[in-house]
Amino acid sequence: MTAYRLTRRASLGLAAVPLLLPLARPARAQRLDRLVFQTDWRAQAEHGGYYQAVAAGLYRKAGIECEIRQGGPSLNIGQLLLTGRVDMTMSNSFEAFTYVREDAPFFTIGSIFQKDPQVLIGHPDTGFDGFEDLKGRTLLIGSGGRVTYWPYLRKKFGLRDEQLRPYTFNMAPFLADRNVVQQGFISSEPYSISKAIGRMPPYLLIADAGFSAYQTTIAISRKLAVEKRDLIQRFVDATLEGWAQYLKGGPATEAANALIKKANPEQTDDRIEYAIKVMNERGIVVSGDALQGGIGAMTDARWQGFYQSMVDVDVLPRGLDVARAYTLDFVNKGIGKPT
């Protein structure tokens, strides 16, 4: 795992393990193009559009047999892509630039999340209302966050490295000290903490500070994108339609959630319902570029702006060819655009 990877597993200091989601073959003899997509963590609502595309038959309608492999705490997803064991992975802006820096033959073809879903969570009734209120508090941030969004927040809000403490992947240190702020994901940790303290804690969405990373992106080899352009376009279109249906509660959403719960029994109906609700309310998927280009949209300007913001805080090196990190060929076609 590279220093610049910022996904759920990286923020926890973990890698990923492939857990296969078996998909039934169609009853009729039908030749389908097979693709393997690797997610960055265990099955959850934050991956719901992919499971919706399976449950609603969108991939099969597009002539694709899509195998979804869920992530977990063991293998390096980037290595799976590098060795050709998977066709595409769930990724992010940081990893795209890491591929450029290391001259690896991979790039980004779409971004499901317009807003990075990471949050900093405080305690109720402690004056924790904005990023300026981070000053003077103990911050539990993992290794991934320390080399990605932390330098950005530190510079913008005058914070200090002395405030940092290790994130131990459980709520106990946070619950024990009301002056502590901990990292999390908007669709998960605030919900878990609310169950422990009896009310929803205040939290700050890092994207609201101007941190403009694309998140939950689709990474692929340049070779596959060029040689099988039609196949990849069909995959992208079916995936984006899956996300549009999932967020609105399409007819196959219950079946999609059943697939999620089967793959990851830790997921419950109420947790999934909360995650979908907060993704919609906070515009995690449909906001920014997606308001005009549809779900998955990206722009040259945002890629360039994010890169420059990371250069300014010494997170990424100067001189990278930003255009090699991504292509706009497969997105910005209006799928899932608000009407």
Description of each model-found segment:
Residues 226-313:
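Secondary-structure end/capping motifs
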Residues 24-26:
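N-terminal signal peptide c-region/cleavage motif recognized by signal peptidases
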Residues 29-187, 205-206, 212:
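Short, glycine-/small- and polar/acidic-enriched structural segments
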Residues 159-164, 203, 264-280, 316-324:
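Short, surface-exposed acidic
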Residues 94-95, 169-266:
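Pocket-lining segment of extracytoplasmic ligand-binding domains
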